């Protein structure tokens, strides 16, 4: 055997390693939850517009000297947020908000590298089981799309607005949560394959799609609450400023505009749709328990209860930053736990897939 053939992908190939792939995806899922948390801090500290350019490579390093800091600060001074809200901000104040946006972007890159590098390695070693290559590629590509959506979101606040579009913020957050769910689902499939080489991948049931739809609405409303700062319109619970249906809803532009843009109405809907989401998830937990998956059922009940309590605490605290961040982090954990629960109840039938 020649040296060149010894180094070829075919000769270095190993048997598929679904267990190792599953552990890798679980680690990346944890990273995604961390990024979601830092994203919440970035939003709540109003740091998201502090970096006015998208430099995927050169932007890795922060300003390294005073001249670089002044240059970055001058760029920030050109956007409406500085002129209308932060006029007079000191360089020290700018450095504080710059840090969180920079960290959020760096962690996003870390997630990207944590997917791309192992994926290329496992693909080169031919260690990816048949039927999973396309799925792992899609998850890896989704990180790149998420980065582009993040910049698209930031760009919405650089010219005419003092904040980002709540529609784009929702797209950014929901894409991250979709990625998280995909990582968990695929990790569970690979874990099952590691235990049983003949295990087929799980498929969503009709009931599962219904649960996802209900949860999706709640997550969308939560993202809009965040993007519109709607959490601040009421700090009382269960009533909103002594009313069940809050005063202050602007219906002048029509019902659809109010439904998608009015902070009072969106806060109200997020507050009460949470009970529909909780009910659907508790029914899911009941089904899990009846089918012997008591650990998954207990985990789901605990996370649902924690998220409901954190939501109420966020309201009555007047959107205390760390409480609100925990609400966002536990929301991400809830997505992961729900994905795992739905996978446990998924349909399984032997099918032929292509890698």
From Swiss-Prot:
Is this entry keyworded Cell membrane? yes
Presence of keyword Cell membrane: yes
Transmembrane region(s): 21-41, 85-102, 136-156, 173-193, 208-228, 264-284, 299-319, 322-342
Name the needed cofactors: heme b
UniProt keyword annotations, A-Z = Cell membrane, Heme biosynthesis, Iron, Membrane, Metal-binding, Oxidoreductase, Transmembrane, Transmembrane helix
Catalytic activity annotated for this protein? Fe(II)-heme o + 2 A + H2O = Fe(II)-heme a + 2 AH2
Tell me the Pfam families matching this sequence: COX15-CtaA (PF02628)
Which GO terms fall under biological process for this protein? heme A biosynthetic process
Q: Which GO terms describe its cellular component?
A: plasma membrane
Location(s), subcellular: Cell membrane
- The EC number(s) this enzyme carries: 1.17.99.9
Q: Where does heme bind?
A: 270, 327
Pathway note: Porphyrin-containing compound metabolism; heme A biosynthesis; heme A from heme O: step 1/1
Q: Enumerate the GO terms in the molecular function aspect.
A: metal ion binding; oxidoreductase activity, acting on NAD(P)H, heme protein as acceptor
What's this protein's family per the entry? Belongs to the COX15/CtaA family. Type 2 subfamily.
According to its UniProt entry, the function of this protein is described as: Catalyzes the conversion of heme O to heme A by two successive hydroxylations of the methyl group at C8. The first hydroxylation forms heme I, the second hydroxylation results in an unstable dihydroxymethyl group, which spontaneously dehydrates, resulting in the formyl group of heme A.
Subunit details: Interacts with CtaB.
Know the name of this protein? Heme A synthase
Report which gene this protein is encoded by. Answer: ctaA
